[in-house]
Amino acid sequence: MSRPILVFDSGIGGLSVLAEIRKSLPHSDYCYLFDNARLPYGELEEQVLIAGCVALVCDLVARTNAMIVVVACNTASTVVLPALRANLSIPVVGVVPAIKPAAQMSKSKRIGLLATPGTVKRHYTHELISQFADDCHVELFGCSELVMMAEQKIATGEMDMHRLADLLAPVVAAQLDVLVLGCTHFPMIQAELQQVLGAGVTLMDSGAAIAKRVVTLLTQQNLIVEQRRVTNEREALGQSVMQAFYTKAEISEGLTTTLIDCGFSTIERITTTN
């Protein structure tokens, strides 16, 4: 196994980001770490979140010799990123809600941000809106329940569309033409969201932008050279190595099946004391 790209989230949402990165670097090795024992992150105190994430990620970086960390979680990106960068010597990439491209795309200049309550209320989010969407009317919608609905869909294949419609009623009423998916879990239920909101609302997430940033940083660190070598070897030998790590006591059969379908050959529980 070559030095992997480590993608980190509280749950399965980061798989949407991982999929975008793999489009750009299909032959790289990947580790996916999801801290599902402490899901959802938006309900944790900040210092508890920081301490747990730093310990968990730094331990796995040391174990796997990862060359870059992608924090594929909006809540962790706004809270934990500085501490991770202070404790790691490798690049750390975070998630930024796609406020800027949403404002540029909107014709009506009525856009929305659908995220967890923590992301919605943070000063960083409001700075993004002031900087990049000052010519737009921006509606903010905070909902943790959607995170658990996405997790439930992956675990069971089921989605309560009536409940989803109830949760999205304020979004429908706002008459937006662009909605930013400000949580990496939400692209996992994008089809269902689109069904409720209708074709008149464009959904935007940050996955492609994160993938582009990863490629840029690997190039700047001269690690893209290693990736080109790995790519040549993998084209000759076959599939890249995919490892998944989780923190909960156990995971559902449905989630295990999803991870296998995504290409993970190793699915392992790791323990955390935080």
UniProtKB/Swiss-Prot annotation:
| Name listed for the protein in its UniProt record | Glutamate racemase
Chemical reaction(s) catalysed:
L-glutamate = D-glutamate
What keywords sit in the KW lines? Cell shape, Cell wall biogenesis/degradation, Isomerase, Peptidoglycan synthesis
Q: What is its EC number?
A: 5.1.1.3
Among InterPro entries, the record links this protein to:
Asp/Glu/hydantoin_racemase, Asp/Glu_race, Asp/Glu_racemase_AS_1, Asp/Glu_racemase_AS_2, Glu_race
The source's domain of life comes to Bacteria
Q: Which family does it belong to?
A: Belongs to the aspartate/glutamate racemases family.
Give the EC class as a word. isomerase
Per UniProt, substrate binds at D9, S10, Y41, G42, N74, T75, T184, H185
Residues at the active site = C73 (proton donor/acceptor), C183 (proton donor/acceptor)
Q: In which pathway is this protein known to take part?
A: Cell wall biogenesis; peptidoglycan biosynthesis
Task: From the UniProt record, give one GO term of the biological process aspect.
Answer: regulation of cell shape
GO terms (molecular function) for this protein are: glutamate racemase activity
User: What's the stated role of this polypeptide?
Assistant: Provides the (R)-glutamate required for cell wall biosynthesis.
Keyword Lipoprotein set for record: no
